[in-house]
Amino acid sequence: MYGWEMLSFNIHDGFLEAIVRGNRSGLLTAADYNNLCQCENLDDVKMHLTATEYGPYLQNEPSPLHTTTIVEKCTLKLVDEYKHMMCQATEPLSTFLQYITYGHMIDNVVLIVTGTLHERDVNELLEKCHPLGMFDSIASLAVAQNMRELYRLVLVDTPLAPYFSECITSEDLDDMNIEIMRNTLYKAYLEDFYKFCEKLGGATAEIMCDLLSFEADRRAVNITINSIGTELTRDDRRKLYSNFGLLYPYGHEELAVCEDVDQVRGVMEKYPPYQAIFAKISYGESQMLDKAFYEEEVRRLCLSFEQQFHYAVFFAYIRLREQEIRNLMWISECVAQNQKNRVHDSVVFIF
Protein backbone atom coordinates (compact mmCIF):
# COMPACT_ATOMS: atom_id res chain seq x y z
CA MET A 1 0.00 0.00 0.00
CA TYR A 2 1.08 3.54 -0.56
CA GLY A 3 0.65 6.89 1.18
CA TRP A 4 -2.10 7.19 3.77
CA GLU A 5 -3.12 3.53 3.40
CA MET A 6 0.23 2.55 4.89
CA LEU A 7 -0.49 4.57 8.04
CA SER A 8 -3.73 2.71 8.79
CA PHE A 9 -2.73 -0.81 7.68
CA ASN A 10 -1.40 -1.90 11.07
CA ILE A 11 -4.57 -0.83 12.89
CA HIS A 12 -6.61 -3.65 11.34
CA ASP A 13 -4.17 -6.05 9.70
CA GLY A 14 -0.73 -5.48 11.24
CA PHE A 15 -1.12 -8.19 13.89
CA LEU A 16 -2.08 -10.86 11.36
CA GLU A 17 0.67 -9.83 8.97
CA ALA A 18 3.19 -10.23 11.80
CA ILE A 19 1.77 -13.68 12.61
CA VAL A 20 2.10 -14.78 8.97
CA ARG A 21 5.65 -13.48 8.69
CA GLY A 22 6.49 -15.38 11.87
CA ASN A 23 4.88 -18.56 10.54
CA ARG A 24 6.92 -18.24 7.37
CA SER A 25 10.10 -18.79 9.39
CA GLY A 26 8.73 -22.22 10.29
CA LEU A 27 8.72 -23.46 6.68
CA LEU A 28 11.11 -26.33 5.99
CA THR A 29 14.59 -25.42 4.76
CA ALA A 30 16.88 -27.14 2.25
CA ALA A 31 18.66 -28.80 5.21
CA ASP A 32 15.32 -30.24 6.42
CA TYR A 33 14.60 -31.63 2.95
CA ASN A 34 18.08 -33.16 2.68
CA ASN A 35 17.50 -34.96 5.99
CA LEU A 36 14.05 -36.14 4.90
CA CYS A 37 15.43 -37.45 1.60
CA GLN A 38 17.80 -39.73 3.53
CA CYS A 39 15.02 -41.43 5.50
CA GLU A 40 14.74 -45.21 5.22
CA ASN A 41 11.05 -45.49 6.13
CA LEU A 42 8.03 -43.36 7.04
CA ASP A 43 8.78 -43.60 10.76
CA ASP A 44 12.08 -41.82 10.04
CA VAL A 45 10.12 -39.15 8.14
CA LYS A 46 7.83 -38.74 11.14
CA MET A 47 10.83 -38.49 13.49
CA HIS A 48 12.35 -35.64 11.44
CA LEU A 49 9.02 -33.83 11.16
CA THR A 50 8.35 -34.01 14.91
CA ALA A 51 11.34 -31.68 15.34
CA THR A 52 9.55 -29.08 13.16
CA GLU A 53 6.26 -27.20 13.53
CA TYR A 54 4.47 -30.34 12.35
CA GLY A 55 5.51 -32.10 15.57
CA PRO A 56 2.25 -31.66 17.55
CA TYR A 57 0.25 -33.01 14.61
CA LEU A 58 2.32 -36.16 14.06
CA GLN A 59 3.82 -37.12 17.41
CA ASN A 60 0.89 -39.30 18.55
CA GLU A 61 0.43 -41.15 15.25
CA PRO A 62 1.06 -44.90 15.70
CA SER A 63 3.04 -47.15 13.37
CA PRO A 64 2.73 -48.30 10.67
CA LEU A 65 2.39 -44.89 9.04
CA HIS A 66 0.99 -44.20 5.59
CA THR A 67 1.72 -41.33 3.23
CA THR A 68 -1.92 -40.24 3.39
CA THR A 69 -1.67 -39.89 7.18
CA ILE A 70 1.39 -37.64 6.95
CA VAL A 71 -0.21 -35.46 4.27
CA GLU A 72 -3.51 -35.30 6.18
CA LYS A 73 -1.83 -34.17 9.43
CA CYS A 74 0.37 -31.61 7.68
CA THR A 75 -2.69 -30.24 5.87
CA LEU A 76 -4.47 -29.99 9.23
CA LYS A 77 -1.77 -27.57 10.39
CA LEU A 78 -2.40 -25.37 7.33
CA VAL A 79 -6.16 -25.48 7.98
CA ASP A 80 -5.69 -24.49 11.63
CA GLU A 81 -3.51 -21.54 10.60
CA TYR A 82 -6.07 -20.46 8.00
CA LYS A 83 -8.93 -20.65 10.52
CA HIS A 84 -6.90 -18.57 12.98
CA MET A 85 -6.38 -15.92 10.30
CA MET A 86 -10.09 -15.91 9.41
CA CYS A 87 -11.09 -15.49 13.07
CA GLN A 88 -8.85 -12.43 13.42
CA ALA A 89 -9.47 -10.84 10.01
CA THR A 90 -11.73 -7.88 9.30
CA GLU A 91 -12.97 -6.63 5.92
CA PRO A 92 -11.60 -6.53 3.27
CA LEU A 93 -8.96 -9.05 4.43
CA SER A 94 -11.59 -11.64 5.39
CA THR A 95 -13.04 -11.56 1.85
CA PHE A 96 -9.50 -11.80 0.42
CA LEU A 97 -8.85 -14.91 2.54
CA GLN A 98 -12.13 -16.47 1.39
CA TYR A 99 -11.08 -16.01 -2.24
CA ILE A 100 -8.00 -18.14 -1.55
CA THR A 101 -10.23 -21.16 -0.78
CA TYR A 102 -12.37 -20.99 -3.93
CA GLY A 103 -9.80 -22.90 -6.00
CA HIS A 104 -10.03 -25.80 -3.54
CA MET A 105 -13.83 -25.66 -3.74
CA ILE A 106 -13.63 -26.05 -7.52
CA ASP A 107 -11.23 -29.00 -7.19
CA ASN A 108 -13.53 -30.65 -4.63
CA VAL A 109 -16.58 -30.24 -6.88
CA VAL A 110 -14.70 -31.84 -9.78
CA LEU A 111 -13.40 -34.65 -7.54
CA ILE A 112 -16.89 -35.56 -6.29
CA VAL A 113 -18.54 -35.35 -9.72
CA THR A 114 -15.77 -37.35 -11.44
CA GLY A 115 -15.74 -39.96 -8.68
CA THR A 116 -19.52 -40.35 -8.86
CA LEU A 117 -19.31 -40.75 -12.63
CA HIS A 118 -16.96 -43.70 -12.07
CA GLU A 119 -19.20 -45.14 -9.32
CA ARG A 120 -16.89 -44.39 -6.40
CA ASP A 121 -18.27 -44.28 -2.85
CA VAL A 122 -19.25 -40.73 -1.85
CA ASN A 123 -17.83 -41.03 1.68
CA GLU A 124 -14.51 -42.19 0.26
CA LEU A 125 -14.49 -39.19 -2.08
CA LEU A 126 -15.33 -36.77 0.74
CA GLU A 127 -12.28 -38.00 2.66
CA LYS A 128 -10.09 -37.04 -0.32
CA CYS A 129 -11.51 -33.51 -0.57
CA HIS A 130 -9.31 -30.63 0.53
CA PRO A 131 -10.60 -29.30 3.89
CA LEU A 132 -10.20 -25.66 2.80
CA GLY A 133 -12.67 -26.29 -0.04
CA MET A 134 -15.50 -27.93 1.91
CA PHE A 135 -19.04 -26.54 2.01
CA ASP A 136 -22.30 -27.75 3.58
CA SER A 137 -24.02 -29.34 0.58
CA ILE A 138 -20.95 -30.91 -1.04
CA ALA A 139 -22.17 -34.51 -0.53
CA SER A 140 -25.29 -33.71 -2.59
CA LEU A 141 -23.13 -33.25 -5.71
CA ALA A 142 -23.40 -36.99 -6.29
CA VAL A 143 -27.04 -36.73 -7.44
CA ALA A 144 -26.43 -34.27 -10.30
CA GLN A 145 -26.65 -35.64 -13.86
CA ASN A 146 -25.74 -32.48 -15.79
CA MET A 147 -24.39 -28.95 -15.29
CA ARG A 148 -27.85 -27.44 -14.86
CA GLU A 149 -28.75 -29.83 -12.04
CA LEU A 150 -25.34 -29.35 -10.47
CA TYR A 151 -26.02 -25.62 -10.21
CA ARG A 152 -29.71 -25.77 -9.26
CA LEU A 153 -29.47 -28.50 -6.61
CA VAL A 154 -26.16 -27.72 -4.95
CA LEU A 155 -24.00 -24.81 -6.03
CA VAL A 156 -26.53 -21.99 -6.15
CA ASP A 157 -25.93 -21.27 -2.44
CA THR A 158 -22.11 -21.44 -2.56
CA PRO A 159 -19.52 -18.78 -3.43
CA LEU A 160 -19.00 -20.60 -6.75
CA ALA A 161 -22.51 -19.73 -8.00
CA PRO A 162 -21.47 -16.60 -9.99
CA TYR A 163 -18.80 -18.61 -11.83
CA PHE A 164 -21.31 -21.09 -13.25
CA SER A 165 -22.94 -18.68 -15.71
CA GLU A 166 -20.79 -20.03 -18.58
CA CYS A 167 -21.10 -23.67 -17.48
CA ILE A 168 -24.85 -24.18 -17.29
CA THR A 169 -25.81 -26.61 -20.06
CA SER A 170 -28.03 -29.66 -20.27
CA GLU A 171 -25.19 -31.87 -21.51
CA ASP A 172 -24.56 -35.00 -19.50
CA LEU A 173 -21.51 -35.01 -17.27
CA ASP A 174 -18.66 -37.00 -18.81
CA ASP A 175 -14.89 -36.76 -18.35
CA MET A 176 -14.43 -34.18 -21.12
CA ASN A 177 -17.31 -31.96 -19.97
CA ILE A 178 -16.12 -32.13 -16.36
CA GLU A 179 -12.62 -30.95 -17.34
CA ILE A 180 -14.13 -28.14 -19.41
CA MET A 181 -16.25 -27.23 -16.38
CA ARG A 182 -13.18 -27.18 -14.12
CA ASN A 183 -11.25 -24.88 -16.43
CA THR A 184 -14.23 -22.61 -17.08
CA LEU A 185 -14.80 -22.23 -13.33
CA TYR A 186 -11.11 -21.53 -12.74
CA LYS A 187 -11.12 -18.91 -15.48
CA ALA A 188 -14.11 -17.11 -13.92
CA TYR A 189 -12.61 -17.43 -10.42
CA LEU A 190 -9.19 -16.05 -11.40
CA GLU A 191 -10.74 -13.14 -13.31
CA ASP A 192 -12.98 -12.31 -10.33
CA PHE A 193 -10.07 -12.53 -7.85
CA TYR A 194 -7.96 -10.34 -10.17
CA LYS A 195 -10.66 -7.64 -10.29
CA PHE A 196 -11.06 -7.77 -6.50
CA CYS A 197 -7.31 -7.26 -6.00
CA GLU A 198 -7.34 -4.37 -8.47
CA LYS A 199 -10.05 -2.68 -6.39
CA LEU A 200 -7.94 -3.06 -3.24
CA GLY A 201 -5.20 -1.04 -4.95
CA GLY A 202 -1.71 -0.24 -3.66
CA ALA A 203 0.95 -2.90 -3.18
CA THR A 204 -1.73 -5.59 -2.79
CA ALA A 205 -2.95 -4.94 -6.34
CA GLU A 206 0.58 -4.68 -7.74
CA ILE A 207 1.86 -7.96 -6.25
CA MET A 208 -1.34 -10.01 -6.41
CA CYS A 209 -2.06 -9.09 -10.02
CA ASP A 210 1.44 -10.28 -10.92
CA LEU A 211 0.95 -13.58 -9.03
CA LEU A 212 -2.51 -14.17 -10.52
CA SER A 213 -1.26 -13.31 -14.02
CA PHE A 214 1.42 -15.96 -13.62
CA GLU A 215 -1.23 -18.45 -12.48
CA ALA A 216 -3.41 -17.60 -15.49
CA ASP A 217 -0.48 -18.03 -17.90
CA ARG A 218 0.50 -21.36 -16.34
CA ARG A 219 -3.06 -22.63 -16.66
CA ALA A 220 -3.14 -21.52 -20.32
CA VAL A 221 0.00 -23.57 -21.01
CA ASN A 222 -1.34 -26.62 -19.15
CA ILE A 223 -4.72 -26.43 -20.91
CA THR A 224 -2.94 -26.28 -24.26
CA ILE A 225 -0.64 -29.24 -23.59
CA ASN A 226 -3.38 -31.38 -22.02
CA SER A 227 -5.78 -30.75 -24.91
CA ILE A 228 -3.31 -31.69 -27.67
CA GLY A 229 -4.65 -34.75 -29.46
CA THR A 230 -8.16 -34.43 -27.97
CA GLU A 231 -11.41 -33.44 -29.66
CA LEU A 232 -11.30 -29.97 -28.09
CA THR A 233 -11.38 -27.40 -30.91
CA ARG A 234 -9.13 -24.36 -31.13
CA ASP A 235 -12.05 -22.06 -30.32
CA ASP A 236 -13.03 -24.16 -27.30
CA ARG A 237 -9.44 -24.11 -26.09
CA ARG A 238 -9.24 -20.33 -26.50
CA LYS A 239 -12.41 -19.85 -24.42
CA LEU A 240 -10.77 -21.57 -21.44
CA TYR A 241 -7.89 -19.06 -21.20
CA SER A 242 -8.26 -16.24 -18.64
CA ASN A 243 -8.68 -12.75 -20.09
CA PHE A 244 -5.60 -11.30 -18.40
CA GLY A 245 -1.95 -12.16 -17.90
CA LEU A 246 1.26 -11.64 -19.84
CA LEU A 247 0.07 -13.96 -22.62
CA TYR A 248 -3.24 -12.13 -23.09
CA PRO A 249 -4.33 -11.67 -25.85
CA TYR A 250 -1.69 -12.41 -28.50
CA GLY A 251 -0.05 -15.34 -26.73
CA HIS A 252 -3.46 -16.94 -26.31
CA GLU A 253 -4.12 -16.72 -30.04
CA GLU A 254 -0.84 -18.54 -30.72
CA LEU A 255 -1.34 -21.17 -28.00
CA ALA A 256 -4.82 -21.97 -29.31
CA VAL A 257 -3.36 -23.33 -32.57
CA CYS A 258 -0.42 -25.28 -31.08
CA GLU A 259 -0.37 -28.97 -31.99
CA ASP A 260 2.64 -30.21 -30.00
CA VAL A 261 4.79 -29.29 -26.99
CA ASP A 262 7.57 -27.77 -29.11
CA GLN A 263 5.11 -25.31 -30.65
CA VAL A 264 4.00 -24.32 -27.13
CA ARG A 265 7.66 -23.83 -26.26
CA GLY A 266 8.13 -21.60 -29.32
CA VAL A 267 5.26 -19.37 -28.19
CA MET A 268 6.44 -19.11 -24.58
CA GLU A 269 10.06 -18.32 -25.48
CA LYS A 270 8.86 -15.04 -27.01
CA TYR A 271 8.09 -13.84 -23.47
CA PRO A 272 11.29 -13.10 -21.49
CA PRO A 273 9.90 -13.97 -18.01
CA TYR A 274 9.14 -17.50 -19.24
CA GLN A 275 12.33 -18.17 -21.19
CA ALA A 276 14.17 -19.44 -18.10
CA ILE A 277 11.37 -21.94 -17.36
CA PHE A 278 11.55 -23.56 -20.79
CA ALA A 279 15.36 -23.42 -20.84
CA LYS A 280 15.27 -26.13 -18.12
CA ILE A 281 13.30 -28.51 -20.32
CA SER A 282 14.52 -30.56 -23.28
CA TYR A 283 12.73 -30.32 -26.61
CA GLY A 284 9.76 -32.65 -26.96
CA GLU A 285 9.24 -33.28 -23.24
CA SER A 286 6.77 -31.79 -20.78
CA GLN A 287 7.19 -34.02 -17.72
CA MET A 288 9.41 -31.54 -15.85
CA LEU A 289 7.36 -28.50 -16.86
CA ASP A 290 5.21 -28.61 -13.70
CA LYS A 291 8.30 -28.53 -11.49
CA ALA A 292 9.78 -25.61 -13.46
CA PHE A 293 6.54 -23.65 -13.06
CA TYR A 294 6.38 -24.47 -9.34
CA GLU A 295 9.96 -23.26 -8.87
CA GLU A 296 9.14 -19.97 -10.59
CA GLU A 297 5.96 -19.61 -8.52
CA VAL A 298 7.89 -20.18 -5.27
CA ARG A 299 10.43 -17.54 -6.30
CA ARG A 300 7.65 -15.01 -6.90
CA LEU A 301 5.84 -15.92 -3.69
CA CYS A 302 9.00 -15.42 -1.64
CA LEU A 303 9.58 -12.02 -3.27
CA SER A 304 6.17 -10.85 -2.03
CA PHE A 305 7.54 -10.90 1.53
CA GLU A 306 10.09 -8.23 0.58
CA GLN A 307 7.39 -5.53 0.81
CA GLN A 308 5.16 -4.67 3.76
CA PHE A 309 1.60 -3.43 4.30
CA HIS A 310 -0.17 -5.62 1.74
CA TYR A 311 -2.35 -8.75 1.62
CA ALA A 312 -0.26 -10.76 -0.83
CA VAL A 313 1.76 -12.21 2.07
CA PHE A 314 -1.33 -14.17 3.19
CA PHE A 315 -1.80 -15.63 -0.28
CA ALA A 316 1.93 -16.33 -0.60
CA TYR A 317 2.20 -18.04 2.78
CA ILE A 318 -0.72 -20.40 2.12
CA ARG A 319 0.66 -21.27 -1.34
CA LEU A 320 4.11 -21.93 0.12
CA ARG A 321 2.61 -24.24 2.75
CA GLU A 322 0.74 -26.08 0.02
CA GLN A 323 3.97 -26.50 -1.93
CA GLU A 324 5.65 -27.80 1.22
CA ILE A 325 2.89 -30.39 1.64
CA ARG A 326 3.33 -31.47 -2.00
CA ASN A 327 7.05 -31.88 -1.30
CA LEU A 328 6.35 -34.00 1.79
CA MET A 329 3.84 -36.15 -0.11
CA TRP A 330 6.39 -36.83 -2.86
CA ILE A 331 9.21 -37.62 -0.41
CA SER A 332 6.94 -39.89 1.65
CA GLU A 333 5.76 -41.78 -1.45
CA CYS A 334 9.33 -42.28 -2.66
CA VAL A 335 10.43 -43.53 0.77
CA ALA A 336 7.39 -45.82 1.13
CA GLN A 337 7.92 -47.33 -2.34
CA ASN A 338 11.71 -47.58 -1.95
CA GLN A 339 12.29 -45.19 -4.87
CA LYS A 340 14.91 -43.03 -3.17
CA ASN A 341 16.72 -42.43 -6.46
CA ARG A 342 13.72 -40.33 -7.57
CA VAL A 343 13.20 -38.46 -4.31
CA HIS A 344 14.66 -35.17 -5.61
CA ASP A 345 12.74 -35.23 -8.91
CA SER A 346 9.72 -33.22 -7.75
CA VAL A 347 10.93 -31.47 -4.59
CA VAL A 348 10.84 -27.68 -4.89
CA PHE A 349 13.04 -25.98 -2.30
CA ILE A 350 11.49 -22.89 -0.70
CA PHE A 351 14.56 -21.66 1.18
UniProtKB/Swiss-Prot annotation:
GO-annotated molecular function: proton-transporting ATPase activity, rotational mechanism
Presence of the UniProt keyword Ion transport in the record: yes
Gene3D superfamilies (alphabetical): ATP synthase (C/AC39) subunit, domain 3, V-type ATP synthase subunit C domain
Record keywords: Hydrogen ion transport, Ion transport, Transport
A Pfam family hit: vATP-synt_AC39
A Gene Ontology term for the protein's cellular component: vacuolar proton-transporting V-type ATPase complex
GO biological process per UniProt: vacuolar acidification; vacuolar transport
InterPro entries in the record: ATPase_csu/dsu_sf, ATPase_V0-cplx_csu/dsu, ATPase_V0-cplx_dsu, V-type_ATPase_csu/dsu, V-type_ATPase_csu/dsu_dom_3
Similarity section: Belongs to the V-ATPase V0D/AC39 subunit family.
Oligomeric and partner information: V-ATPase is a heteromultimeric enzyme composed of a peripheral catalytic V1 complex (components A to H) attached to an integral membrane V0 proton pore complex (components: a, c, c', c'' and d).
Function: Subunit of the integral membrane V0 complex of vacuolar ATPase. Vacuolar ATPase is responsible for acidifying a variety of intracellular compartments in eukaryotic cells, thus providing most of the energy required for transport processes in the vacuolar system.
Protein name: Probable V-type proton ATPase subunit d
Species of provenance: Oryza sativa subsp. japonica (Rice)
